[in-house]
Amino acid sequence: MNKKVIYFLCTGNSCRSQMAEGWGKKYLGDEWDVYSAGIEAHGVNPNAVKAMKEIGIDISEQTSDTIDQELLQKADLVVTLCGHAADVCPATPSNKERVHWGFDDPAKAEGTDEEKWAVFRRVRDEIGKRIKTFAETGK
């Protein structure tokens, strides 16, 4: 059986889409090939790696990539995770489903180190919950 392809997109492929790829591989890996990319490639944020490691998901080997047009064409579902990607995302083929799941950008969190870290954990958990719901309901 061929797996479907899900493609998580955000602005820099640094935090949200990286965490989504990690969660996606955990919850969707049996039925979906899971990828992520960004309008730009900012490198994987070390705090995203740390936040995911804290809950037992290793994303340290994932790479920060710009959107691959061939993969975009192959994708069965494109999920944008932030406003910028939703606005600037390349056109997707009309037969491809595209949805937007908005999450705060933890890299832009302000405050003390402790407050910034709390945002990474919150966004990590929100993304995980959303992907788990999708895995269970298809929505």
UniProtKB/Swiss-Prot annotation:
Catalytic activity: arsenate + [thioredoxin]-dithiol + H(+) = arsenite + [thioredoxin]-disulfide + H2O
Disulfide pairings: 10-82, 82-89
Subcellular location: Cytoplasm
Molecular function GO terms recorded: arsenate reductase (thioredoxin) activity; protein tyrosine phosphatase activity
Family recorded in the similarity comment: Belongs to the low molecular weight phosphotyrosine protein phosphatase family. Thioredoxin-coupled ArsC subfamily.
Domain of life (superkingdom): Bacteria
Full protein name: Arsenate reductase
Gene3D superfamilies assigned: 3.40.50.2300
One term under GO cellular component: cytoplasm
Main location: cytoplasm
CDD domains: LMWP_ArsC
Catalytic residues as annotated in Swiss-Prot or TrEMBL: 10 (nucleophile), 82 (nucleophile), 89 (nucleophile)
Name of the gene: arsC
Species assigned in the record: Halalkalibacterium halodurans (strain ATCC BAA-125 / DSM 18197 / FERM 7344 / JCM 9153 / C-125) (Bacillus halodurans)
SMART domains per the UniProt record, alphabetical: LMWPc
Task of the protein: Catalyzes the reduction of arsenate [As(V)] to arsenite [As(III)].
Documented EC number(s): 1.20.4.4
Pfam families to which the protein is assigned, alphabetical: LMWPc (PF01451)
Keywords, alphabetical: Arsenical resistance, Cytoplasm, Disulfide bond, Oxidoreductase, Redox-active center
InterPro entries: Arsenate_reductase_ArsC (IPR014064), Ptyr_pPase (IPR023485), Ptyr_pPase_sf (IPR036196)
Gene Ontology biological process: response to arsenic-containing substance
